[in-house]
Amino acid sequence: MVVLHEILDGPNGDDPNNNPQEGEDNQNENPQEEVENLRNLLELPEELIERLIAHIPRCYYPYISLVSRDFRQVITSDKLFRTRSLLGFNEPVLYALIGSTQTPLSWFFLRWSNFPLELHRIRSLPTVLLGAAVVTIGYKMYVMGGTIGLNHHVSTVIVIDCRNHTWNYLPDMKRARYRAAAGEIGGRIYVIGGRKKQDADWVEVFNATTESWETVSSVCPNDASANGVFSTYVVMQGRIFALDRWGCFAYKPVQGLWQSWGVASELTRFWHPLSSFTVIGELLYTVDLTCSLGHPIVVYYPNESVWRPVMGFHLPILSQCWSKIANFGGKLVIFCTCLGTFKHILCIVIALEARQGGHIWGVVESNSRVFRDDMMLPYIRLCQTVTF
């Protein structure tokens, strides 16, 4: 049995425990006054409605959308997203793709405004192909390439609108790609590798405004794998860092320059295919189960080329193979299973602070069990954070 909080359609919003009868019992004793108040609300100018809604946490939007069609249009508009961004009211929402040993992958999302923290299942989105590259820009999530079966690599691209959990196809990439590296820099998405290494078409760039692809001519690094397969990637300091079996590579689109580190470099000391990584404040974070620096969370300082521990808190013994970390609005989020509780997924939220000497300290703000499968062993394919 899977225990979670599911998104339901209908007047009860996203709370399955809501009782419609309770709403009727608690209605205003003066229905005429209620009707008048609603009529006045519906007569507000659209711009005023937009500014009012912009100040309200997004967790209440399913309820607000029931007021009228005009309110629903405002909630799903690009203009509201821009207004919230200008006012500094954007909120992070974390998406996770979770499956188990015998059940298919499903999308879930987590809002920081929900207490206690809960995962919400999304049934309207397609799963992500094995080996697909995923990049987020604002409230959109771009899923590119992957494989169908063992050797049928694809160039397919879809975009997910996380405001209303809809999706559609975008123009295909010019080449099929499997386990490519990708990242957004300057509003454009660069996709690297995922196919046989050759200078002419190893890099493609997607213009999100015109929704078009262009091939970027680039001299491939000599020591990169010939098949162009990458195990993981991040964006840091305006560069796309990608890891393959031979080492780490960084591509800077502005100059079209490559930089490489071997498998024995300091950067790859903790960066390996089994680990999950995220970038917060231009620093690279990961989990180190060996605690070789005295702590399970370590951070890489690219300007100094050094790893240091994140201090100030204790964690349960994590399972590295089943742990994923993400940047959740500047906080470090860990989705993990722990030794002895492999059928549970915990969500640990850590607030970070840079102290004197440049050391990072953390405080655990939340440690919640957000998923349980009593029958199967759950696993987390990916975690991505969008902001809107």
UniProtKB/Swiss-Prot annotation:
Q: Where is the composition biased (Acidic residues)?
A: 22-33
Ordered alphabetically, the record's keywords are: Kelch repeat, Repeat
Q: Spell out the residue ranges that the record assigns to Kelch repeats.
A: 140-187, 189-233
Pfam families given for it? Answer: F-box, Kelch_FKB95
Which SUPFAM superfamilies does this chain map to? F-box domain (SSF81383), Kelch motif (SSF117281)
The yes or no answer to whether the keyword Repeat is present is: yes
Does Methyltransferase show up as a keyword for this record? no
Q: Where do Low complexity bias regions lie?
A: 9-21
User: Cross-referenced InterPro entries, in alphabetical order?
Assistant: F-box-like_dom_sf, F-box/kelch-repeat_ARATH, F-box_dom, Kelch-typ_b-propeller, Kelch_1
Q: What is the protein name for this chain?
A: Putative F-box/kelch-repeat protein At2g29820
Write down the species: Arabidopsis thaliana
